[in-house]
Amino acid sequence: MNRTSPDSEQPPASEPVWERPWSVEEIRRSSQNWSLAADAGLLQFLQEFSQQTISRTHEIKKQVDGLIQETKATHCRLHNVFNDFLMLSNTQFIENRVYDEEVEDQALKTEAEKAEQEKTREQKEIDLIPKVQEAVNYGLQVLDSAFEQLDIKAGNSDSEEEDANERVELILEPKDLYIDRPLPYLIGSKLFMEQEDVGLGELSSEEGSVGSDRGSIVDSEDEKEEEESDDFASHSDNEQNQHITQMSDEEEDDDADLFADSEKEGDDIEDIEESAKSKRPTSFADELAARIKGDVSNQRKEGHTDGKPQRTVKEKKERRTPADDEEDILFPPPTLTDEDFSPFGSRGGLFSDRQGLFDDDDESDLFKEAPRGQPAQGPVSEESPPSPKPGKKIPAGAVSVFLGYTDVSGSTSAPSLKEFQKHEQSTPGKSPHLPAPTGLFDDDDNDSDEDDNFFMPSSSKPSKTDKVKPTTIIFDDDEGDLFKEKTTALPAASVSQTDENKARTDKTITLPSSKNPKLVSETKTQKGLFSDEEDSEDLFSSQSSSKTKSASVLSSQPPASVSLFGDEDEEDNLFGSAAAKKQTSSLPPQSQEKAKPSEQPPKKASALFSSDEEDQWSVADSQTKLASERKSKGERWDAGTNQGQEAKAVKKTNLFEEEDDDGVDLFAIAKDSQKKTQRTSLLFEDDTDSGSSLFSLPPTSVPPAATKKESIPKVPLLFSDEEDSEVPSGVKPVDLKAENAAASPEVGSADVANVAQKEGLLPTSDQEAGGPSDIFSSSSPLDKGAKGRTKTVLSLFDEDEDKVEDDSNTCAPQGGLEKGVKTDRRPKSTGVFQDEELLFSHKLQKDNDPDVDLFAGTKKTRLSMPSGGSLFGDDDDDDLFSTAKTQPAQPVVPEKKGTLRKDHKPPELTEGSKEKSTWKAETAQDSSGLTPFKSREPSSRIGKIQANLAINPATLLPSVAPQIPGAKPASCELAFPSSEPARSHIREAVPTLPGSEEAGVSFDLPAQADTLHSANKGRVKVRGKRRPQTRAARRLAAQESSEAEDVTIDRGPVTQLSSSPVLPNGHQPLLQPRMASGETSSEKAMAVPWEGGPVLSAVDRSFFVKSLPQTGNEAHLFDSGDIFPKSTGSQSMEGASVKAGETPAHSSAGRKEKSLVFPDLSEASGVDDLFQSAKPRPTKKRNPFPLLEDEEDLFADQKGKKNQWKSDSHQDVVSKTQDIFEDDIFATEAIKKPFPKKREKERTLEPNLFDDNIDIFADLTVKPKEKPKKKVTAKSMFDDDTDDIFSSGLQAKASKPKSQSAEAVSELRSENKVSNIFDDPLNAFGSQ
């Protein structure tokens, strides 16, 4: 082809060869003489070849595409064929099936037709009769089993005689299938797991009979009611009664006959009715027999022959049996005849089973209860419990059906077991109310009485549980009171006191609660068994019950709290159980409810989580014994109740009348606070140590007897504030810590100081004097731990924190950190606690008023501290404090004050400050507590403090002002409670008493009045100022503290300083006086009196604490500042806190005024004083509370003994410098990790702290005496409390290890400190 093609192509050779494609042959020929033309031809050839190839490829591609399309089309057709076959197959299958059936039916029909054609009409009727009768019987059975017959004229039985024909008309109400059919058990419940049929096994056999019985029961009830109404209406007319009874029977008969006849023929019905009417005068048996024998004879026969018809007859018989029985009541012989009559019995056949069970009365009761009976079975088990308790519990639990379970699982362990057994016995009954249908009737008979109770206890099976609870007193108080009080939780004020009485009675019962631990553990296990019920109970008992418990448990716990703090029990008494009672009544509603919501979940958890709760309680109790008791009891309720009993015994011994309850309430709150503190300690291991120290400290605080009386008002306020702060403050754990610390500080002045630091809300005096205790608690933990602790507590008591910081330079860093926390907590404590307390009860209002004042006073103290902002400026907290300086409101420099004191230990404390800055980080705890406090701070603090201050100060000013000598502790405590309601109160109550009595008596009354008035205004301002706090936690706390201090200065003798310069100027004057060592000593003394003075009245205290804390705190800071200001200029702060522009003399006079005006400030300064009490305990000489005396003496000396105090205070300051270092070292011990030296000092100072505290108190007399005094006084004051104190120490140990393994060393030190603190404060108090 190639050749041919080129050959063929050659002819057109005329065409240029290079313009046409060459053939292969041509190319070969010209290969030897290749030319450009050959190239062109080759190119053309190649191009043509390429085009051909491409075209061929396209063609092939098209062909392939066509093939693919064909294949797809073929595939589609194939599928269509498949579908067609499938459709055909299905269609044929269906058609075949239908066709077969049709064919068969047709064949049958044809055969039947043929047969029928053969039969006559009569034969057809005869054949149909059985079928019709069977259908009628089935219908009647359905009506009987599935419907309840309602008689329209049931109420008009008399008029029914005339309208007998109309009775044929029936109203059918479908039955509730689940009345007879119990629901399955709760998934996961014990019965559910144990029984294979999960509660549904019996139904298959019983369902039909039960259903029919059920229907007959309902019908019989209706008939009974009708008959009864007929009988009563026409009781005299036997014919009427018979007629009416017949009517009702006729009604049933007509119903059966009607339906049977409706299916059959109306003629039969008419005949039956006519025959029945004619026979109505006769007995029911005759009538029924006649009617049944009449047209229905076939039906009756078939009913007898057929089981189903027979059943219908039985149902009818039973139906009539109630009517007959009723009629029998009217006519006994007919009843026998009716029952004997098989036809009549067949009419009542529904109740044939019930005949034995029910006479009409029983049956009617049963049926009335039948609806109840379903729940009644639950009551059957519950019946034993007193209905009143169930009544209370029902509202409290408010858990509808499951309430009983909740109570069963939660409220009783053993009771719950019993109830579970009962539930198992009555499986249907176990479902909230649904009992087994048979059980229902049996239960109805048994529970007819129970049903009455049942409805009350039905929801609260705990009623039984309650009964068992007395045995399981834990639950009785815990859940019974919880739910009872929950119902009464709102009126918690009354409820709390009532619950206190209950708690006492329960505590008497609770003493057996040693048994209760097992029950509690059982309850825990049972709760575990029923996680759902457990959760529900926890939800209700923790939340609702938490409130109820907070009311009831707190009320009952107050005694337990007293037991918690053996020292605190007495201290509660000391601080005034009246105030405690007020708190109890008011606190339980608000603070208890709130505190216990946070607390009680743990309390409830104590049963569920015994170790945590117990740990918290043991720490909160500050008594290892009590903690162990509670653990053994397995529930804090038992422990709280036992402790409450012990505490009540002690309290009654100490405070006997009002103070016993108050002490109980206070300490119940203290418990809560401790509990929360425990939580906080869980959050912060250092806090755990602090909590231990706090708890150990409380025993120390308790010893001062004189302080107790004065403190008693304060303690209630303290605790009300504590609980209120606990409740109101978003940071309940922190508040609780503060409260715990406060509760423990109450034990003794040394404890007060230690507790103050533990509280962390008492940064200045608390950290200074309480620094050792805080250090004890946080000594093994790092200074951060102490600071975190302080912060946690500080959140409760921001002002106290500031004070503490000012008081001890070591604490200053903590104070800085605590500032934010305390500031946050302070507002919360004041606003939340005060407002809620005020809202909840007058007592709380009164107590809270002092508390509010305490908070305000504490704030003022802090404000005074902020005056020494420059002092804090030196510290790392300088930022916080510098902010305080920059912000007038930030006179929060009270924290700087604390920093001044801390600054006084600048070498270590500057580190401590930095470490406290680390504590700021550690303030994770703070932030956790602080953040809630912050949020509450502005709104709750300003609004609540304003409301509370306005209300409470008025209430407390008169009562607390008179208390100044004895109430100063309360006032001081109240002052500190503003930031740390409970702990500050307690601590300061101890130190303030002496000072308030000595230095603040004459000054307290006048100064308090002015200060309180000013404090109210100033506090409001302070709140406003505190809110704008620039820094997160510290600056807010510092600002608020400084603002509060400014306000306080404006309010009271501190007002002499000027409110605006009080912080800056006040601090400057304080610094100036402090610069002079003598002046510093006197100022320190003055600060102590201020604190002591404010302690005088809770209201005055808080106000004075505000006004006085400036001077008092500043003075106090400068007292310790005298020691420190030399090193850091803390003195200038104290001078400033004494009075903005006051000279040492002016400061002393102002301080005395403040001590008078600021018993709260003394208390607030009490933190400083607490630290001073650790250092200038000379004040302690004068009063049972050396710290208070120190403050008081300091104030008095500042005025009268200014030089003495300068020398003594200076010496105290020197020892305080050491002591403060020691105290602060203890605080630093909390901060210790950052400062090993401080920690060592803390170790040495732990004993020294007690010694220093003793010395401080001794400085009032003699510093060395202070130590012995504290030890001796604490012991003598609280012999019972000494045990509690030691147990508190033990608890502190237990809680410390629990909280932190890292705190082991610090725990040991803290324990030693705690014991020392207890010994010293006890001795000091006892000596005084």
Curated annotation (Swiss-Prot):
<feature type="modified residue" description="Phosphothreonine">
    <location>
        <position position="321"/>
    </location>
</feature>
<feature type="short sequence motif" description="LFa 17">
    <location>
        <begin position="1317"/>
        <end position="1325"/>
    </location>
</feature>
<feature type="modified residue" description="Phosphoserine">
    <location>
        <position position="387"/>
    </location>
</feature>
<feature type="short sequence motif" description="LFa 10">
    <location>
        <begin position="871"/>
        <end position="881"/>
    </location>
</feature>
<feature type="region of interest" description="Disordered">
    <location>
        <begin position="1115"/>
        <end position="1210"/>
    </location>
</feature>
<keyword id="KW-0813">Transport</keyword>
<feature type="compositionally biased region" description="Polar residues">
    <location>
        <begin position="690"/>
        <end position="699"/>
    </location>
</feature>
<feature type="region of interest" description="Sufficient for interaction with WASHC3, WASHC4 and WASHC5; required for interaction with WASHC1">
    <location>
        <begin position="1"/>
        <end position="219"/>
    </location>
</feature>
<feature type="compositionally biased region" description="Acidic residues">
    <location>
        <begin position="441"/>
        <end position="453"/>
    </location>
</feature>
<feature type="modified residue" description="Phosphoserine">
    <location>
        <position position="384"/>
    </location>
</feature>
<feature type="modified residue" description="Phosphoserine">
    <location>
        <position position="1327"/>
    </location>
</feature>
<feature type="short sequence motif" description="LFa 12">
    <location>
        <begin position="1157"/>
        <end position="1171"/>
    </location>
</feature>
<feature type="modified residue" description="Phosphoserine">
    <location>
        <position position="1077"/>
    </location>
</feature>
<feature type="modified residue" description="Phosphoserine">
    <location>
        <position position="204"/>
    </location>
</feature>
<dbReference type="GO" id="GO:0070273">
    <property type="term" value="F:phosphatidylinositol-4-phosphate binding"/>
</dbReference>
<dbReference type="InterPro" id="IPR029341">
    <property type="entry name" value="FAM21/CAPZIP"/>
</dbReference>
<dbReference type="GO" id="GO:1901981">
    <property type="term" value="F:phosphatidylinositol phosphate binding"/>
</dbReference>
<feature type="region of interest" description="Disordered">
    <location>
        <begin position="991"/>
        <end position="1088"/>
    </location>
</feature>
<feature type="modified residue" description="Phosphoserine">
    <location>
        <position position="1162"/>
    </location>
</feature>
<feature type="modified residue" description="Phosphoserine">
    <location>
        <position position="611"/>
    </location>
</feature>
<feature type="short sequence motif" description="LFa 3">
    <location>
        <begin position="474"/>
        <end position="483"/>
    </location>
</feature>
<dbReference type="GO" id="GO:0005829">
    <property type="term" value="C:cytosol"/>
</dbReference>
<keyword id="KW-0597">Phosphoprotein</keyword>
<feature type="short sequence motif" description="LFa 16">
    <location>
        <begin position="1277"/>
        <end position="1286"/>
    </location>
</feature>
<feature type="region of interest" description="Disordered">
    <location>
        <begin position="1289"/>
        <end position="1310"/>
    </location>
</feature>
<feature type="modified residue" description="Phosphoserine">
    <location>
        <position position="780"/>
    </location>
</feature>
<feature type="modified residue" description="Phosphoserine">
    <location>
        <position position="610"/>
    </location>
</feature>
<dbReference type="GO" id="GO:0005547">
    <property type="term" value="F:phosphatidylinositol-3,4,5-trisphosphate binding"/>
</dbReference>
<feature type="modified residue" description="Phosphoserine">
    <location>
        <position position="867"/>
    </location>
</feature>
<feature type="modified residue" description="Phosphoserine">
    <location>
        <position position="531"/>
    </location>
</feature>
<feature type="region of interest" description="Disordered">
    <location>
        <begin position="675"/>
        <end position="830"/>
    </location>
</feature>
<dbReference type="GO" id="GO:1900024">
    <property type="term" value="P:regulation of substrate adhesion-dependent cell spreading"/>
</dbReference>
<feature type="compositionally biased region" description="Polar residues">
    <location>
        <begin position="582"/>
        <end position="592"/>
    </location>
</feature>
<feature type="compositionally biased region" description="Low complexity">
    <location>
        <begin position="201"/>
        <end position="213"/>
    </location>
</feature>
<dbReference type="GO" id="GO:0080025">
    <property type="term" value="F:phosphatidylinositol-3,5-bisphosphate binding"/>
</dbReference>
<feature type="short sequence motif" description="LFa 11">
    <location>
        <begin position="1117"/>
        <end position="1124"/>
    </location>
</feature>
<feature type="short sequence motif" description="LFa 15">
    <location>
        <begin position="1249"/>
        <end position="1257"/>
    </location>
</feature>
<feature type="region of interest" description="Interaction with VPS35">
    <location>
        <begin position="347"/>
        <end position="1328"/>
    </location>
</feature>
<feature type="modified residue" description="Phosphoserine">
    <location>
        <position position="1165"/>
    </location>
</feature>
<feature type="compositionally biased region" description="Polar residues">
    <location>
        <begin position="508"/>
        <end position="528"/>
    </location>
</feature>
<keyword id="KW-0967">Endosome</keyword>
<comment type="subunit">
    <text>Component of the WASH core complex also described as WASH regulatory complex (SHRC) composed of WASHC1, WASHC2, WASHC3, WASHC4 and WASHC5; in the complex interacts (via N-terminus) directly with WASHC1. The WASH core complex associates with the F-actin-capping protein dimer (formed by CAPZA1, CAPZA2 or CAPZA3 and CAPZB) in a transient or substoichiometric manner which was initially described as WASH complex. Interacts with VPS35; mediates the association with the retromer CSC complex. Interacts with FKBP15.</text>
</comment>
